[in-house]
From Swiss-Prot:
Residues 424-668 are cytoplasmic. GO terms for biological process: acute inflammatory response to antigenic stimulus; adaptive immune response; heterophilic cell-cell adhesion via plasma membrane cell adhesion molecules; immunological synapse formation; innate immune response; lipopolysaccharide-mediated signaling pathway; positive regulation of cytokine production involved in inflammatory response; positive regulation of T cell proliferation. It is a single-pass type I membrane protein. The gene is CD6. Residues 586-596, 619-632 have a biased composition (Polar residues). One of its GO terms (cellular component) is extracellular region. Keywords: Adaptive immunity, Cell adhesion, Cell membrane, Disulfide bond, Glycoprotein, Immunity, Innate immunity, Membrane, Phosphoprotein, Repeat, Secreted, Signal, Transmembrane, Transmembrane helix. Detected on thymocytes. Detected on peripheral blood T-cells. Detected on natural killer (NK) cells. Soluble CD6 is detected in blood serum (at protein level). Detected in spleen, thymus, appendix, lymph node and peripheral blood leukocytes. Expressed by thymocytes, mature T-cells, a subset of B-cells known as B-1 cells, and by some cells in the brain. This is T-cell differentiation antigen CD6. The chain crosses the membrane at residues 403-423. Residues 18-402 are extracellular.
Amino acid sequence: MWLFFGITGLLTAALSGHPSPAPPDQLNTSSAESELWEPGERLPVRLTNGSSSCSGTVEVRLEASWEPACGALWDSRAAEAVCRALGCGGAEAASQLAPPTPELPPPPAAGNTSVAANATLAGAPALLCSGAEWRLCEVVEHACRSDGRRARVTCAENRALRLVDGGGACAGRVEMLEHGEWGSVCDDTWDLEDAHVVCRQLGCGWAVQALPGLHFTPGRGPIHRDQVNCSGAEAYLWDCPGLPGQHYCGHKEDAGAVCSEHQSWRLTGGADRCEGQVEVHFRGVWNTVCDSEWYPSEAKVLCQSLGCGTAVERPKGLPHSLSGRMYYSCNGEELTLSNCSWRFNNSNLCSQSLAARVLCSASRSLHNLSTPEVPASVQTVTIESSVTVKIENKESRELMLLIPSIVLGILLLGSLIFIAFILLRIKGKYALPVMVNHQHLPTTIPAGSNSYQPVPITIPKEVFMLPIQVQAPPPEDSDSGSDSDYEHYDFSAQPPVALTTFYNSQRHRVTDEEVQQSRFQMPPLEEGLEELHASHIPTANPGHCITDPPSLGPQYHPRSNSESSTSSGEDYCNSPKSKLPPWNPQVFSSERSSFLEQPPNLELAGTQPAFSAGPPADDSSSTSSGEWYQNFQPPPQPPSEEQFGCPGSPSPQPDSTDNDDYDDISAA
């Protein structure tokens, strides 16, 4: 059993790799040659807290930790061996010793580093080399007992990286130190992955922006890299694939970067940029500053870094309104607040705090209040005039473009309205009369005053009624037809004289308004039409005392309303057998209406020709002996047989007057 436990312990010790404890009187040394180093493996030595992996404090790995090498036993052979092992060329002629360790350890360098907490470096390891190669070196534990300095070296092929002209160590133009000279990087194929490598190498977090050339001030000196193409996993920028700087890439194409740990400040809510609430841009967002430790030293550093002089007043702030909160603690000698001790989103340090505010000496409002010798009104006008003029110039330029646009729009609208109005006027002048004359003609004629019932008279469209003329048939033989002693008279030699008739009386007067509404000329022979209708009443034959049968075309001869019948050779026969039919106004009205609705194609009885246009009705003076006359009387009474008789021989009749030969028509 005891044998089993012993074998198990030996196997455990062998697998763990711990060396067997050395005697108390002998130092525990481990040769570098005992640990085989092959390419690709990580060396047990490194340089930290420098500008690159080729300069800084020498650290060696002991078991699972990194320990700084003792500076008391540091020599040139060890420095040369370390620089060659790290691929940084040879060491510089004079090796430098590290200063005494400060009370507070420096911030950790890039990579997985750990710093010993020993303040006196008691028992620190030492690197002892017998030649300028790494295989001739060995690490001795607890070699230094009282020396408090650390070994430090700068190799000849030192490479460094920095960001300049960006307002801090974590933003600006990218520059590399190569062959002892600082140079820039060309922005060809420069992207966010390349900027990530830069920010991580400098300990500034991650990249927020990868900026092209001319965003920052152009650099000077050579251009060390062109077409850099990093994957984002490289530890150093010079480990990324790329090309050496060419001559065709100038400083106008210098690449830049802004890292998440970069801090920039501003003052808001004041009269100008030198007064207001303190805000810091950190990790891509704006944050407020806690006033729990906002003292004159912190305010002084901020005002100086902003170029606003010194701090004059620290007014009480408002509650925090932004997402993040930053805490600063300065001694007053720092260049920027980022060089002070700071904490971000620490609830303990910023509890029950408000947003910090500051008033710097370069503020315009403070300058106006602190110069009583200059009138405030004059100072205000002088300072604000420059700003006001810029605003007015901008607004005036906008107004100069706006006002002509409005005027042109109004003119265009007015011209369109005017053109539309002119077109409507032209259309109404030439098109409306045609529409009225051809499409909206009146269809009825108002009845006369003697009509007791409305008599609609339909007139065909576009057919104007002409005076109806009945051409009297020429007598075959005026001398042989009757014993007329009338002389032949040419009626066309002397125009007839218009006399006052029933048609032109007051009862048939058509006013001007009715004429304008009707828009057509009324036919002048309305009374003639009435007489023509009335001619349906049969008359007696003077020779044989036989009533003539009524014909479809009643015998009607146009005569003047003022004609005077003085013929003495005509035979008149009033036969008692030809009694007048009883008066029927309705029948007469219907016959009149139907007659007027018919087109004026009238025919005389017998072999009379159709109506034709001839002289006016007023020109007919019926003096021929061969004409038949019919005298109409309003409503007639049935006469007795004694009043009718056939005369034996014709005898000259006395001259009849107008009142005897013509009766007024009173029937409607």
